């Protein structure tokens, strides 16, 4: 076996340009400059009213194991781009920075910091790729699962996507994110072992095909399993599948726990009604109807509108792949950097595309909730030294349409970004997965129904403090003036 497969180092799970930038910083003597980066996404996924943050546990594990291994260094040496002195620098690399982040299960919104990294320029740069890779995927899947949960009501939702996921890691961590977002169990046995997620499963069409007969297959399954859910659509749902499931259930009686039947094809609304009728007429009124087959929140919503008699939803491909929007688009931007005098100077990216203009400065996100009922008034992005939690009233306004504003009184301001690492040491205790799921449910409950609609939700307020807003405008003007002067000087030099 190639020795590389025995090396579980994730340090090179990065883009080449991160290493190249580290080399540039190192050679020009700025690698130890202090810097602050913030990760955020620009648009909510699936046209949803919120997103559910997920991925922090894996970020923590990644940071705690962030070391260049011998095989990492040997590989980089083999590329022939890097001098030995730089490779020695990498070999001695340790993450000594600080990370603040939303906790898993937190509701998050567009254009607000989700993760904030403070440290040397080099170490902040190195972790960008892995951090975005983790947050982009897991937050996307958790949000998709929440949408499924929203339309499913109290019906059990099972995650069935492992075979359709984009490789092993996506299946495992996608399952975890789906559980946080709202799924009740998974078919993925490894995820059950790793994370304590309840596991659930029935059987495949191949079992029925192997016995060439619904009855023989169901009987064989019942002889080896007490809990039985029979897949009834291999040949003919109403003429063979369900009648033979009923036959086996009656023959075995109390020897098995006949949980119900699963439908994986056909007109789910029509078939579920007919199947329900057959089960009820046979006396199995408590038997459940399980449905699978490329389901998602839109299909479930429509099936419920059509009066489908489905009790349990098995969600696979369209959840684990985030089928209708397979990318979140989270970005990682430098917001402050140390100047030659050791002073932190705010910085930003400007663009002719308004949505790509970043907000400079080290910031905190505050969730503003009413004391009267605990409902959220919106999120308030402020510079780090601002303390809205110490104010009696708070003026909130839309960062683009400033005439949309309000003054909030009798409120609580809760900081969203929590300390995870301080000077390279973890200071945050990772909660149990069930605690994360319960926390997410609490946050959903605090959100107004208007923001939870699957179709055309109201836009949740994400406002800037006056100080943050003013600084952003001042920075834009300052950068544009600096660019203008330098471009004029460059034009003069080129004209010589």
Predicted region positions:
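Residues that form generic nucleotide/phosphate-binding pockets
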Residues: 59-66, 76, 89, 134, ...
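A residue-level signal for beta-strand positions that form part of recognition/binding surfaces
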Residues: 36-38, 96, 157, 331, ...
């Amino acid at each position: 076996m190639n020795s590389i497969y025995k090396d579980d180092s994730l340090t090179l799970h990065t883009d080449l340009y991160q290493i190249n930038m580290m080399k540039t910083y190192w050679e020009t003597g700025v690698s130890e400059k202090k810097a602050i980066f913030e990760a955020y996404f620009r648009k909510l996924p699936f046209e949803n009213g919120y997103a559910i943050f997920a991925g922090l546990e894996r970020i923590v594990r990644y940071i705690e194991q962030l070391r260049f291994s011998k095989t990492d260094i040997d590989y980089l040496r083999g590329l022939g781009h890097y001098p030995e002195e730089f490779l020695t620098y990498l070999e001695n690399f340790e993450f000594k920075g600080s990370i603040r982040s939303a906790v898993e299960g937190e509701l998050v919104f567009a254009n607000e910091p989700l993760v904030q990294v403070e440290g040397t320029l080099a170490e902040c740069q190195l972790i960008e790729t892995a951090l975005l890779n983790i947050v982009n995927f897991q937050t996307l899947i958790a949000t998709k699962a929440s949408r499924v949960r929203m339309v499913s009501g109290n019906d059990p939702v099972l995650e069935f996507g492992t075979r359709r996921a984009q490789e092993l890691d996506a299946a495992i961590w996608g399952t975890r994110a789906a559980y946080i977002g709202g799924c009740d169990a998974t078919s993925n046995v490894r995820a059950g072992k790793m994370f304590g997620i309840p596991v659930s499963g029935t059987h495949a069409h191949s079992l029925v095909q192997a016995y060439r007969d619904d009855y023989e297959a169901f009987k064989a399954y019942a002889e080896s399993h007490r809990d039985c859910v029979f897949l009834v659509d291999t040949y003919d749902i109403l003429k063979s599948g369900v009648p033979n499931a009923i036959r086996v259930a009656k023959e075995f009686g109390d020897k098995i726990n006949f949980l119900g039947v699963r439908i994986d094809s056909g007109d789910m609304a029509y078939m579920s009604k007919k199947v329900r009728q057959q089960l009820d007429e046979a006396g199995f009124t408590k038997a459940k109807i399980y449905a699978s087959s490329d389901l998602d929140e839109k299909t479930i919503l429509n099936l419920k509108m059509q009066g489908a008699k489905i009790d349990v939803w098995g969600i696979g491909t369209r959840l684990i792949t985030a089928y209708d929007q397979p990318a979140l688009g989270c970005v990682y931007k430098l917001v402050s950097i140390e100047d030659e005098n050791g002073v932190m100077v705010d910085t930003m990216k400007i663009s002719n595309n308004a949505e790509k203009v970043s907000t400079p400065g080290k910031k905190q996100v505050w969730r503003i909730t009413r004391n009267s009922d605990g409902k959220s008034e919106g999120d308030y992005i402020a510079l780090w030294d601002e303390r809205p939690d110490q104010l009696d009233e708070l003026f909130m306004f839309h960062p683009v349409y400033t005439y949309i504003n309000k003054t909030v009184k009798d409120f609580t301001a809760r900081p969203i970004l929590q300390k995870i690492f301080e000077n390279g040491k973890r200071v945050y205790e990772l909660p149990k997965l069930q605690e994360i799921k319960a926390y997410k449910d609490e946050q959903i409950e605090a959100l107004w129904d208007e923001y939870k609609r699957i179709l055309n939700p109201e836009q949740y307020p994400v406002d800037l403090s006056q100080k943050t807003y003013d600084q952003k405008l001042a920075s834009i003007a300052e950068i544009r003036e600096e660019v203008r002067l330098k471009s004029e000087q460059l034009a003069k030099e080129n004209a010589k």
